Curated annotation (Swiss-Prot):
Zinc finger C2H2-type: from-to: 208-231, 360-382, 388-410, 421-444, 462-484, 490-513, 517-540, 546-568, 574-596, 602-624, 630-653, 667-689, 695-717, 723-746
Basic and acidic residues bias: start-end ranges: 279-296
Gene Ontology CC annotation, any one: nucleus
PROSITE patterns the UniProt entry points to: BTB, ZINC_FINGER_C2H2_1, ZINC_FINGER_C2H2_2
PANTHER family from the UniProt entry: C2H2-TYPE DOMAIN-CONTAINING PROTEIN, KRAB AND ZINC FINGER DOMAIN-CONTAINING
Record localization: Nucleus
Name listed for the protein in its UniProt record: Zinc finger and BTB domain-containing protein 41
Limits of the BTB domain: 89-153
Chief location bin: nucleus
Biased composition (Acidic residues): 267-276, 297-336
Keywords of the record: DNA-binding, Metal-binding, Nucleus, Repeat, Transcription, Transcription regulation, Zinc, Zinc-finger
Biased composition (Basic residues): 252-261
Length: 908
């Protein structure tokens, strides 16, 4: 082979980048499994490459390259990843307490069950399986990652059932094919049909065995049904017995179609020698079976000697095979209208063509049938014909099935059933539930639907031997039996707690993990979804069908009406064990308990105030928003709350004495016996005795007894001056300062009124004076009685004050002569270290100097003791931290020269 040079990697780069393929590159040849290339030409220039890129690529330039091992490598990597820590797994599957790590995308692709769960809740990280064992699930998880099963033969049915439950389609197909192949191989190994029958019979439980044919049944009820329907005649030969035995392991087949498969037919020499006799016997048996089928389908029958004619009703245990019975009937019975048979004269059916099917209608009672055999059996109800006779007591019946039931009374081997089933409408006793159902449908048709619904809900097919509770399905009974054991197989996915039932686990999760559940309409929260649903139905929707017979009020629930009637009766059954207060409703009692426990769970976002109830918070928020949505139709006045509007309308416009309906509650102070209307007012008052000041300023650490006082105090630390004077340009931080300015500077309010107001406040303030303060108290009282200029008593009082105490001063009006134009000098005996003199400031031009002096001449500085509760208004006190306090108080400009009143000397 001629050696050729290989092309460099430029060729590959050209293919990847999409270069134009020239003829020189097509010289590549495959020789002996190796790809070789001829010498490539020189690399094209950039201009040529750009022209080639502008040309549209042709389809033959593209190549399909695939890796056969990539899929397997991907699954292998994912399988290895889930078995190591840490991993990229994002799902935890818990089966019988054992945890399996998996990838969501893998289980969602392979299982429709997981796909539905993860699609519904994409954020789910934990899934718990209750109906699958951990060993079986381990096989299925291995299959999802490796597409292979490595199981024992006996495990195949269990894995198949779990695969159907999890809806793993590929696993179901694979296991079904394996199961069928194994079953066919097992059948081919058998030498004869008898061995096959023996093998299949051995698989059945040996707990219940038929004494006639030695058949085995798993349940006693199946044996009873077998005895009642099979051994009505013992004249059938070996073939019939073989056919009846084969019936026991046929799955979901019709009870009316019991043909034996061809492979199981008995072809022994004895039957072959019988010749025509065997054929006659076979023909007789076939006719007898057909007659039995027709008889069993008769809707009218008698079940006792009293000649009560009943209609047939399919029992609960036959409900599973009802559809298959119809299919088999279509194969064996002639369709309606094919043959009239031996129908009595005058009872010829009326044929009705309905949807490509003929229906037979009885001319006597207008009942319809789709099979001629059923109609023939029905005609015996009208003719009175009873062709089936008991060979023991010669009692005759119109159908073979009723004769079979009757023969159970004469059988010694079968336990005789007493008439323990009582009709709820006529109190008649019946031997079985089936005959009772026929009786109700025949003689109480108006109550038939009610009886059937009760029968389905209270079926005794599966009954617990411990508590005698009945269930309609076997899995329900099996799950119920867990309650009588110590097992707790149901684990909570959020915690480590286990439960005996799924319902108990669900209630636990709703109460402790999934709540609270808020109402979208009113915002109220509930611990579980049941209470939320009940709240929505009762509060926000539904009809008010319960009406109070006293006041006519309508409510949605009966329990609500019962609680409403307590208003008229005065009953209050809910008693608080802490304070002894009684309540009419349980909800009011539970809300009251929050008061004792200080459970204020609803907080205002604006001011931080907390409330016990959500509706209280909603009403409080209207204070911040200023919303007044409730307007009076008479006067147009608006209110923030509806109850306030109601009280206003009744009291103002209707003239009702609304407040007389409510008993006033008063709270008395235990110390001073003072009475307050509100409990909060009493609490604030009691702080005057205890000295408690719970509200502290975070800036200056000053404490206050009332929160409102702290709020006003905080304005001092800010630069905001929100209160403006309407008469001048003066601004104030507090509203009371603005009021004082208007009253005293602009003279809108007379000094006498202001003085009287000050006197009232001074006398109303609760004060406690020490022995040192009694002198000042007497002087104050004397001044209020006869306002005049203070004499030297004030100076004498000031001499007793400690030098280390800063003496507060206040402005007191005095009588000055009109001719005097200079201020009377006053000096104090305070040390200079307490307050320093402010530096001189330029005089303001907004107010004339003469006006300033004339205004100041009306006041003098009167010192007061420092260790008393100030008997004057707070706005009258000078703040040493604010040099322009006096100017602000009088409405002067901040630049006006104001001398500090706490100087080292007080000139007199």
């Amino acid at each position: 082979m001629k050696k050729r040079r290989k092309v460099t990697s430029n060729l590959d780069e050209k293919i990847h980048l999409g270069y134009h393929k020239d003829s020189s590159e097509e010289n590549a040849a495959v020789e002996c499994g190796q790809v070789t290339y001829t010498q490539a030409p020189e690399r094209p220039t950039p201009e040529a490459a750009q022209r080639c890129q502008e040309l549209p690529p042709s389809p033959d330039q593209r190549k399909l390259l695939s890796s056969l091992q990539y899929n397997k490598n991907l699954l292998k990597y994912l399988n290895d990843d889930r078995q190591k820590q840490p991993s990229f797994c994002d799902l935890l599957i818990i089966v019988e307490g054992k945890e399996f790590s998996a990838h969501k995308v893998v289980v969602a692709v392979g299982s429709s069950y997981f796909h539905a769960c993860l699609s519904k809740n994409p954020s789910t990280d934990v899934v718990t399986l209750d109906h699958v064992t951990h060993s079986v699930f381990q096989h299925l998880l291995e299959f999802l990652y490796t597409s292979e099963f490595f199981v024992y033969k006996y495990e195949i049915p269990l894995v198949l059932e779990a695969a159907k439950f999890l809806d793993i389609i590929d696993a179901v197909k694979l296991l079904n094919n394996e199961n069928v192949a194994a079953f066919q191989a097992e059948l081919t190994e058998k030498s004869s049909p008898e061995e096959t029958l023996n093998e299949l019979t051995g698989r059945l439980s040996s707990s219940h065995q038929c004494k006639f044919c030695s058949r085995h049944f798993c349940y006693k009820k199946s044996l009873e049904n077998h005895l009642a329907k099979t051994h009505r005649s013992l004249l059938l030969g070996k073939k019939h017995g073989l056919k009846m035995l084969e019936r026991s392991f046929s799955t979901r087949r019709s009870k009316r179609n019991r043909k034996c498969p061809v492979k199981f037919e008995d072809t022994s020499d004895d039957e072959q020698e019988s010749g025509d006799g065997s054929d006659n016997l076979h023909q007789e048996s076939s006719e007898k079976e057909r007659s039995d089928r027709n008889d069993s389908e008769d809707p009218g029958s008698e079940y006792n000697a009293e000649d009560e004619e009943l209609e047939e009703e399919v029992s609960d245990e036959d409900s599973d095979t009802e559809q298959s019975d119809k299919d088999n009937d279509a194969e064996e019975e002639p369709e309606a209208g094919d043959s009239a048979g031996s129908i009595h004269e005058g009872l010829a059916p009326v044929i009705i063509q309905n949807s490509n099917k003929k229906i037979l209608q009885c001319p006597k009672c207008d009942k319809t049938f789709d099979r001629i055999g059923k109609y023939e059996s029905h005609t015996r109800v009208h003719t009175g014909e009873k062709p089936f006779e008991c060979d023991i007591c010669h009692q005759r019946y119109s159908t073979k099935s009723n004769l079979t039931v009757h023969r159970k009374k004469h059988s010694n081997e079968v336990e005789f059933h007493r008439k323990e089933h009582k009709c709820p409408y006529c109190n008649k006793l019946h031997a079985s539930k089936k005959t009772l159902a026929k009786h109700v449908k025949r003689f109480h048709p108006e109550n038939a639907q009610e009886f059937i619904s009760i029968k389905k809900t209270k079926s005794e097919s599966w009954k617990c031997d411990i508590c005698k509770k009945s269930f309609t399905r076997r899995p329900h009974l099996e799950e119920h039996m867990i309650l009588h054991s110590q097992d707790k197989p149901f684990k909570c996915t959020y915690c480590e707690e286990h439960f005996k039932s799924r319902f108990a686990r669900l209630k636990h999760q709703e109460k402790f993990h999934l709540g609270p559940f808020p109402c979208d309409i009113c915002g109220r929260q509930f611990n579980d979804t049941g209470n939320l649903k009940r709240h929505i139905e009762c509060t926000h929707g539904g009809k008010r069908k319960w009406t109070c017979f006293i006041c006519g009020k309508s409510v949605r629930e009966r329990t609500t009406l019962k609680e409403h009637l307590r208003i008229h009766s005065g009953e209050k059954p809910h008693l608080c064990s802490i304070c002894g207060q009684s309540f009419r409703h349980g909800s009011s009692y539970r809300l009251h308990l929050r008061v004792h426990h200080d459970d204020k769970r609803y907080e205002c976002d604006e001011c931080g105030k907390t409330f016990i109830r959500h509706d209280h918070l909603t009403k409080h928020k209207k204070i911040h928003s200023g919303e007044k949505a409730h307007q009076c139709e008479e006067c147009g006045k608006c209110f923030g709350r509806r109850d306030h509007l109601t009280v206003h309308y009744k009291s103002v416009h209707l003239g009702e004495k609304v407040w007389q309906k409510y008993k006033a509650t008063f709270h008395q102070c235990d110390v001073c016996k003072k009475i307050f209307k509100g409990k909060s007012s009493l609490e604030m008052h009691f702080r005057t005795h205890s000295g408690e000041k719970p509200y502290k300023c975070q800036i200056c650490n000053q404490s206050f007894r009332i929160k409102k006082t702290l709020t006003k105090h905080l304005v001092i630390h800010s630069d905001a001056r929100p209160f403006n004077c309407q008469h001048c340009n003066a601004t104030f931080k507090r509203k009371d300062k603005l009021k004082y300015h208007i009253d005293h500077v602009h003279g809108i309010k007379s000094p006498d009124d202001s003085l009287s107001t000050s006197e009232e406040k001074l006398m109303s303030l609760p004060m406690e004076y020490s022995s040192d303060d009694k002198i000042f108290q007497a002087e104050t009282k004397q001044y209020l009685d006869q306002p005049k200029v203070y004499q030297s008593e004030a100076k004498t009082m000031l001499q007793n004050v400690s030098a280390e105490v800063c003496v507060p001063v206040t402005l007191v009006p005095v009588q000055m002569p009109d001719t005097s134009s200079d201020l009377v000098p006053h000096t104090t005996t305070l040390p200079t270290s307490s307050h320093e003199m402010l530096p001189p400031q330029p005089q303001s031009t907004d107010y004339p100097r003469a006006a300033d002096l004339a205004f100041l001449e009306k006041y003098t500085l009167t010192p007061q003791p420092a260790n008393i509760v100030h008997p004057v208004r707070p706005e009258q006190m000078l703040d040493p931290r604010e040099p322009s306090y006096l100017g602000t108080l009088l409405g002067l400009d901040s630049t006006a020269a104001v001398q500090n009143m706490c100087s080292s000397e007080h000139r007199s």
